[in-house]
A protein has these predicted regions:
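A generic structural micro-feature
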Residues: 3-5, 31, 79-85, 103-106
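The catalytic Nudix box helix
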Residues: 34-68
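Active-site-adjacent beta-strand/loop module that shapes the phosphate/pyrophosphate-binding cleft
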Residues: 72-98
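Flexible, glycine-rich phosphate/dinucleotide-binding loops
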Residues: 20, 28, 73-75, 118
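NUDIX/MutT-family hydrolases
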Residues: 90, 100-132
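Hydrophobic pocket/interface hotspot
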Residues: 22, 49, 53, 109
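Short connector loops at helix/strand junctions that flank enzyme active sites
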Residues: 6, 14, 34, 46, ...
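N-terminal strand-loop-strand
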Residues: 1-34, 93
C-alpha cells in the first residue's frame, strides 16, 4: 500500500538546441537521465532546481519555464510504498560552459541534439524527451 510521496524535480537544460543528459547508476545499472532530484521539505520546486543543479553540476539558472507535469500514477522503483510525482522545467543556464560534476554518483554528462535517438531509460523521461524534440 502506498503511504507517501516522493516529489522529483528535473531540468531540461538546453543550449544551442542541445539537451544536457547525465549518466549515473540507478538500481544496479547505468542510466541516462536529466539533471535534478528530490524536493526537500520546506523547499519550492524552483529552489529545488537551483539547489540540485548547483550541488550536482556547479550550474546556475537564469530563466525557467514549466515544461511537463507527470500525468499518470507512477510507483517508486527505489523507495518502497512511495508514489512519485515528477515536474520538469525548461531552463536556461547562466554559464553552461562552467559545468563541473560535483556529485560522485554522476559518471558523465553529454549534450544531445533534437534529432538524436531517445537515450533515456526511465519511462517518463522518454515522454519528456519526445515532447522536447517536437518544440520549434
Amino acid at each position: 500500500m502506498i503511504d507517501g510521496f516522493n516529489v522529483r524535480i528535473y531540468a531540461l537544460c538546453e543550449v544551442n538546441d542541445r539537451l544536457l543528459v547525465l549518466h549515473e547508476p540507478f538500481m544496479g545499472k547505468m542510466v541516462c537521465k536529466l539533471p535534478g532530484g528530490g524536493l526537500e521539505f520546506g523547499e519550492g520546486p524552483i529552489d529545488c532546481l537551483q539547489r540540485e543543479l548547483k550541488e550536482e553540476l556547479n550550474l546556475e539558472i537564469c530563466k525557467y519555464t514549466p515544461f511537463y507535469i507527470q500525468e499518470h500514477y507512477v510507483e517508486s522503483l527505489a523507495k518502497n510504498n512511495k508514489q512519485i510525482v515528477m515536474l520538469y522545467f525548461l531552463v536556461q543556464l547562466v554559464e553552461p560552459e562552467k559545468i563541473n560534476i560535483l556529485d560522485p554518483q554522476i559518471a558523465s554528462y553529454r549534450w544531445i541534439s533534437k534529432d538524436s535517438d531517445c537515450p533515456f531509460d526511465l519511462p517518463v523521461d522518454r515522454i519528456v524527451f519526445k515532447k522536447w524534440q517536437n518544440l520549434l
